[in-house]
């Protein structure tokens, strides 16, 4: 099992200062001797619901402990990277920053991935009671491979302790087609008979491996 930062940038408040953060992060990665390994760091290929077309970062660490340590206790990161200008990271960018644990090796070149950050529950009863059972049937049909679907180990900055979903498809196009399919939109999301945005707010992004 490995640890991951899964980060959805919501907004960049100070582009110049944030650009300096990104440059410093590149140096941090180089100096980490492979401990900190970005496996995706770009805007998503597609967004849905409350998804935002801003940087979507997946950073791999050898273990969950390494991922937590790097973000919370490594001064090389929070002093020399995100707070190098002497101000909190929140002054420069708003990020839904979560730390999760899952098996390594899931990111495969050419495959497509749903990365979904639940930001808020509005009608949790219908979501859990009706939509999630339909989702389980959808997954059981081999529609996709689920690598993570639960709250994170830790949430920081603008992160939330709500479920984070990581689902794999054979290709980017397959991931997009699945998101736009009747099987997902009607049979799963429509299981409660009400619009998704009346039950849950999700930052839904699709990326390519």
Describe these PLM feature segments.
Residues 76-94, 183-198:
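Short arginine-rich
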Residues 1-72, 92-182, 202-209:
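Short S/T/G/P-rich N-terminal loop/turn motif that feeds into the first structured element of a domain
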């Amino acid at each position: 099992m490995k640890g991951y930062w899964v980060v959805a940038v919501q907004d960049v408040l100070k582009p110049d200062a944030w650009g300096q953060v990104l440059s410093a992060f590149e140096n941090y990665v180089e100096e980490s001797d492979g401990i900190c390994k970005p496996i995706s760091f770009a805007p998503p290929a597609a967004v849905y619901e409350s998804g935002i077309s801003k940087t979507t970062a997946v950073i791999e660490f050898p273990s969950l402990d390494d991922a937590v340590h790097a973000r919370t206790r490594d001064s090389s990161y929070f002093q020399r990277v995100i707070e190098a200008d002497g101000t909190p990271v929140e002054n420069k960018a708003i990020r839904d920053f979560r730390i999760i644990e899952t098996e390594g090796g899931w990111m495969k070149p050419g495959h497509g991935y749903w990365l979904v950050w639940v930001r808020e529950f509005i009608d949790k009863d219908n979501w859990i009671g009706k939509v999630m059972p339909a989702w389980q049937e959808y997954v059981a049909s081999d529609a996709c491979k689920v690598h993570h679907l639960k709250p994170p180990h830790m949430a920081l900055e603008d992160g939330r302790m709500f479920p984070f979903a990581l689902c794999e498809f054979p290709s980017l196009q397959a991931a997009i087609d699945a998101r736009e399919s009747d099987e997902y939109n009607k049979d799963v999301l429509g299981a409660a008979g009400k619009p998704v945005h009346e039950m849950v707010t999700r930052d839904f992004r699709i990326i390519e491996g």
